[in-house]
């Protein structure tokens, strides 16, 4: 199967694959048909009703506005270091500019995949389980620590993280694409130990999930209104999706059916670097880096992956070590 991501997300794909096998065994062996899908339009109308709820909207807006009130304007960080922001400041004639330009002309994207071995993957998963952390938040910590390291120890880091709005049975079985991205902004000092930093990110993400019905475009609009940033600028260079897709399907007639998923670039994107992390059938994980070739090369992805792994495995081995010490030692 080759699906367009605009039509279906990974959660929808899981349901579809299971249903396809159930349909096969229904026609081949006479087993029951898969359960009826929930009508997509019905779920969409519920979404629109939530969005139109003035009290809910006010709470969501307050959450995002409070972040800006407390922390002020975000600060751009780039995997290529502070020279990128300095270049934007020169182009716009503003030495205090805190956002950088989005590439709008040369949008070609290349892909570089790296495979993490099963035993190493299991170490990360065990750490998450033992400390009640999600893999997403551990990955966010790895990326933000690298960004901090290559940007002279910058403490204020923002990464765009994709989430799936499928918390109910109806949402899970309604098909379509229900992914949405929100900025995960944390200010973490170098004295903070690795585990505490992971919990800081997790606490922020948990709060974001509570307000995930909010339109992310409104967050951008509010920042433009407050900080008067130039058109086509952003505070983020990195985007993350973690997809815990199963690598096998259990079917009552067919037994265990192994499956393999791979993401393809459509050739163009306005995101400078978009990392998708998924599980592989051998028990490992695949790190798929999609990057704009106008400004990035494969070597940039090699450095990012290499240092992400150094940071993560140093951190899980010595969770009491400070973020500053980890950045120095790796």
Predicted regions and their residues:
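Short amphipathic alpha-helices and their capping loops
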Residues: 40-109
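Short, flexible turn/loop "capping" segments at secondary-structure junctions
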Residues: 103-107, 174-179, 280-284
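His-Asp-centered acyl/peptidyl-transfer active-site segments
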Residues: 51-61, 75, 127-136, 150-260, ...
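Active-site-proximal acidic secondary-structure segment that organizes catalysis
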Residues: 1-42, 300-314
């Amino acid at each position: 199967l080759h699906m367009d991501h605009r039509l279906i997300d990974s959660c929808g794909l899981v349901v579809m694959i299971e249903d396809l096998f159930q349909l096969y065994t229904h026609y081949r062996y006479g087993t029951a048909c898969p359960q009826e899908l929930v009508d997509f339009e019905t779920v969409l109308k519920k979404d629109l009703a939530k969005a139109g709820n003035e009290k809910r909207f006010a709470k969501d807006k307050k959450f995002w506005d409070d972040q800006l009130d407390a922390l002020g304007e975000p600060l751009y960080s780039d995997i290529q270091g502070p020279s990128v922001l300095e270049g934007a400041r020169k182009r716009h004639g503003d030495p205090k500019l805190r956002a950088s330009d989005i590439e709008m002309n040369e949008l070609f994207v290349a892909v570089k995949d790296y495979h993490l071995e099963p035993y190493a993957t299991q170490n990360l998963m065990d750490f998450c389980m033992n400390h009640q952390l999600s893999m997403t938040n551990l990955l966010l910590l790895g990326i933000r620590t690298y960004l901090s390291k290559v940007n002279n120890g910058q403490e204020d880091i923002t990464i765009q993280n994709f989430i799936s709005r499928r918390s109910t049975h109806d949402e899970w079985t309604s098909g379509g694409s229900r992914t949405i991205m929100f900025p995960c902004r944390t200010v973490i000092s170098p004295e903070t130990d690795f585990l505490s930093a992971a919990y800081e990110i997790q606490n922020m993400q948990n709060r974001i999930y509570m307000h995930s019905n909010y339109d992310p475009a409104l967050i951008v609009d509010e920042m433009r209104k407050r900080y008067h940033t130039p058109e086509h600028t952003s505070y983020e260079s990195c985007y993350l999706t973690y997809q815990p897709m199963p690598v096998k399907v259990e079917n009552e007639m067919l037994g265990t059916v192994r499956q393999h998923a791979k993401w393809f670039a459509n050739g163009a994107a306005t995101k400078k670097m978009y990392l998708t992390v998924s599980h592989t059938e051998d028990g490992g994980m695949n790190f798929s880096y999609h990057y704009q070739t106008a400004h990035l090369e494969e070597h940039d992805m090699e450095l990012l992956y290499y240092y992400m792994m150094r940071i993560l495995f140093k951190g899980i081995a010595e969770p009491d070590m400070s973020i500053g010490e980890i950045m120095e030692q790796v």
